[in-house]
């Protein structure tokens, strides 16, 4: 079903990502990564903030912003992970994307650490987190412009975090 939904999203100019998303200050903070990377952990620690998903997020273009820039929106989907409750059927403009992995090599005491990711590397990592399993030439020709727009429109960074109670306070400071 996710593969079919991905094909439909692609035809509409969007993508389905293996990602979670939490709405903070009116913007979706998207965290994309493979199974076991901490998507559900971050979603569960969101407190009272709306969780769009802990497993898969649809990303699609919306109206152009006031400054003429592309605005991308994150949408909740019916495909959730372990969070069967507390996920909202809503959307929000994408504020930032964090690429996450199961790596927890932080210095003790730091709730999180971020690093810039090059646009080319961002495209590659996001491509790996789509649900498109057979990438034909036609699919790639449709997908790459979407990913390029995504990378050009939204700040994408790598996030390593320790799942402490104050991890979102640290993320909010980083997104400030």
Residue ranges and their predicted role:
Residues 1-16:
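N-terminal pre-Walker A segment at the start of P-loop NTPase domains
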Residues 37-39:
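Conserved glycine(s) of the Walker
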Residues 18-20, 24-34, 45-176:
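Glycine-rich, often acidic-flanked micro-motifs
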Residues 42:
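Hydrophobic positions on the alpha1 helix immediately C-terminal to the Walker A/P-loop
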């Amino acid at each position: 079903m996710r593969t079919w939904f991905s094909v439909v999203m692609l035809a509409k100019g969007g993508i389905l990502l293996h990602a979670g998303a939490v709405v903070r200050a009116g913007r979706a903070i998207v965290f994309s990564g493979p199974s076991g990377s901490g998507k559900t952990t971050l979603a569960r620690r969101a407190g009272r903030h709306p969780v769009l998903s802990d497993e898969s997020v649809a990303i699609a273009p919306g109206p152009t912003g006031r400054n003429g820039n592309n605005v991308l929106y994150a949408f909740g989907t019916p495909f959730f992970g372990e969070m069967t409750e507390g996920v909202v059927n809503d959307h929000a403009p994408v504020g930032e994307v964090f690429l996450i992995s199961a790596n927890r090599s932080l210095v003790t005491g730091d709730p999180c650490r971020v690093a810039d990711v090059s646009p080319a590397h961002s495209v590659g990592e996001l491509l790996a987190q789509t649900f498109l399993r057979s990438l034909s030439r036609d699919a790639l020709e449709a997908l790459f412009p979407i990913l390029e727009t995504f990378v050009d429109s939204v700040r994408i960074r790598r996030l390593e975090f320790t799942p402490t109670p104050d991890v979102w306070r640290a993320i909010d400071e980083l997104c400030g």
